[in-house]
């Protein structure tokens, strides 16, 4: 058995942690800035949450085509056959470009219908949503292509390039958020323009590095690559999984919006903050989960099952330790975090009533993400799809019905259902891992 060294894990994980933190920081920066805009704070904060939710849904649904390419590149890297996937990478890049442009155009044209019909936005909230949406939607193609390129970098066993690019984007977003909001007084439009500028910069730099450091490029390939259909099948599995994820998140935002009475947007604004904190937390340990996926994909290509078991054991304790530390910090600075997020008293009080659920979810979320990352890396997309369907249908929906319709817990009911959902997701993958990998014969290291 070839034991994966801690140094190798950290080489991939630490840059991925920083990259992962920067991504939600860009979104979190918009949220914090919105929470400190004095005029119509609740509506501005709600608009940022609603639009960010839709764009994230769009992104994480269509990003699955690029997520699948990571395992394909990792396989080729492990076998020393990168030249055989040049055409496949080019076709995935062109596919991402076409999908993203069509999606942005369609979303821009139908923006008011989407916000009114699916998010129940109206009045002042709708006006702010449209202002923010009409700018941010054009960042979608830039972000999708950037993340596709970063997926290629990860399959290439390099996470440092993505880290440098993400840091650059985060700094640009932070600086121009301040300039556009506090100096130019563009308010919510300033938030949108700062994000778009950061996304454009990250895309340009990503393309430059891809051309200079990897054998992959944008070019038109004659004929379909032999592995293109396999990649599409894996993408379809992840697409179903991601669609259900975004359906759950959309459902939660819709319910949070409907829970508000007489135009009060306190609940949806608070739900936005809780989602942002939860998302930020996951990226603190998701770098190690991603590293597990990259290494496991390489090991699985040569059937090194015992090495995979040892890798998972190492990472299990790492992510559990990180998530437990996050929970402890959140408990110690419980009220300070709420004050940092917003100065609105109503939102702060509701935040304090529900934040403890987010804290308790951290260790379970970390373990769930670990097995998700490992399974993505090995290309076990059907297992991920099926686990998600079961967790949603048998976990989230029944829990949501009980908490909201029978117990009437309001926002607490939404997050209690999230808790049950994440337990189901992690539990199913853990049981599958035990049944699959502990029945496999040990292969010699190569």
Predicted regions and their residues:
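Transmembrane helix-bundle signature of multi-pass secondary active exporters and lipid flippases
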Residues: 17-71, 136-143, 233-298, 319-327, ...
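Short runs within selected transmembrane alpha-helices of multi-pass transporters and secretion channels
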Residues: 63-66, 135-154, 162-173, 191-206, ...
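Short alpha-helical transmembrane segments in multi-pass integral membrane proteins
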Residues: 1-16, 73-141, 172, 183-236, ...
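Hydrophobic alpha-helical transmembrane segments in multi-pass integral membrane proteins
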Residues: 396-404
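Small-residue-rich hydrophobic transmembrane alpha-helices
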Residues: 45-105, 146-162, 268-332, 366-379, ...
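Hydrophobic/aromatic residues in alpha-helical transmembrane segments
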Residues: 14, 30, 69, 110-111, ...
């Amino acid at each position: 058995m070839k034991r994966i060294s801690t140094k190798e894990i950290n080489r991939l994980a630490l840059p991925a942690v920083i990259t992962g933190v920067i991504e939600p920081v860009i979104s979190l920066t918009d949220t914090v800035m919105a929470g400190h805009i004095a005029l119509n704070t609740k509506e501005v904060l709600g608009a940022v949450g609603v639009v960010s939710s839709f764009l994230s849904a769009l992104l994480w649904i269509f990003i699955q085509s690029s997520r699948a390419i990571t395992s394909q590149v990792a396989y080729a890297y492990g076998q020393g056959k990168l030249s055989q996937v040049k055409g496949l990478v080019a076709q995935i890049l062109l596919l991402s470009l076409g999908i993203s442009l069509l999606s942005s155009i369609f979303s821009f044209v139908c923006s008011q219908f989407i916000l009114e019909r699916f998010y129940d936005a109206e009045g002042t909230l709708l006006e702010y949503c449209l202002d923010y949406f009409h700018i941010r939607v054009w960042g979608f193609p830039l972000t999708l292509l950037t993340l596709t390129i970063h997926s290629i970098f990860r399959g290439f066993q390099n996470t440092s390039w993505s880290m440098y690019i993400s840091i650059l984007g985060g700094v640009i977003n932070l600086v121009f958020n301040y300039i556009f909001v506090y100096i130019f007084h563009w308010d919510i439009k300033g938030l949108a323009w700062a994000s778009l500028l950061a996304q454009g910069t990250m895309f340009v730099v990503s393309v430059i590095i891809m051309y200079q450091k990897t054998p992959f490029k944008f070019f038109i390939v004659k004929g379909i690559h032999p592995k293109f259909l396999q990649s599409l099948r894996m993408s379809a599995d992840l697409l179903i999984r991601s669609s259900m994820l975004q359906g759950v998140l959309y459902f939660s935002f819709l319910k949070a919006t409907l829970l508000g009475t007489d135009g009060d947007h306190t609940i949806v604004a608070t739900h936005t903050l809780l989602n942002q904190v939860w998302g930020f937390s996951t990226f603190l340990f998701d770098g190690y989960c991603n590293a597990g996926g990259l290494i496991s994909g390489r090991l699985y290509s040569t059937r090194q099952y015992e090495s995979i078991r040892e890798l998972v054991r190492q990472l299990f304790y790492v992510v559990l330790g990180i998530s437990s530390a996050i929970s402890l910090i959140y408990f110690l600075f419980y009220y300070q975090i709420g004050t940092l997020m917003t100065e609105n008293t109503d939102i702060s009080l509701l935040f304090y009533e529900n934040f403890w659920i987010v804290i308790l979810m951290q260790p379970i979320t970390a373990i769930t993400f670990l097995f998700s990352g490992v399974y993505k890396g090995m290309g076990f997309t059907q297992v991920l799809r099926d686990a998600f369907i079961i967790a949603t249908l048998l976990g989230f929906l029944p829990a949501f019905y009980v908490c909201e319709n029978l117990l009437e817990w309001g926002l607490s009911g939404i997050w209690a259902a999230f808790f049950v959902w994440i337990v189901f997701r992690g539990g199913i993958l853990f049981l599958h891992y035990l049944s699959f990998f502990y029945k496999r014969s040990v292969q010699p290291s190569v």
